[in-house]
Amino acid sequence: MARYFRRRKFCRFTAENVVEIDYKDVATLKNYITESGKIVPSRITGTRAKYQRQLARAIKRARYLALLPYTDNHQ
């Protein structure tokens, strides 16, 4: 029986030598929130703890400044 090997998760921010995650970079932040607007946990994305904290802070700042929605569109 063939075994399925899950792809190893890696931190994108470590690989790209990112110093600080910017709250104005909405395109990057959108990759780390769900369709309903929740922050995706690091066990799913593979982001290191240091960058996960920065990511959460940047997403919350972007939400406060209305760059990102708090929730999805209600109709």
UniProtKB/Swiss-Prot annotation:
Q: Which Gene3D superfamilies match?
A: Ribosomal protein S18
Q: Which domain of life is it from?
A: Bacteria
A GO biological process of this protein is: translation
A cellular component term, taken from the record's GO annotations: cytosolic small ribosomal subunit
> Any keyword Protein biosynthesis?
no
Recorded hits in Pfam families, A to Z, give: Ribosomal_S18
Q: Which UniProt keywords apply?
A: Ribonucleoprotein, Ribosomal protein, RNA-binding, rRNA-binding
**InterPro entries hit by this protein:** Ribosomal_bS18 (IPR001648), Ribosomal_bS18_CS (IPR018275), Ribosomal_bS18_sf (IPR036870)
Q: Which NCBIfam families match?
A: S18
Say which family it is in.
Answer: Belongs to the bacterial ribosomal protein bS18 family.
Q: Which HAMAP family match?
A: Ribosomal_bS18
The subunit structure is: Part of the 30S ribosomal subunit. Forms a tight heterodimer with protein bS6.
The protein, known as = Small ribosomal subunit protein bS18
Q: Which organism is it from?
A: Pasteurella multocida (strain Pm70)
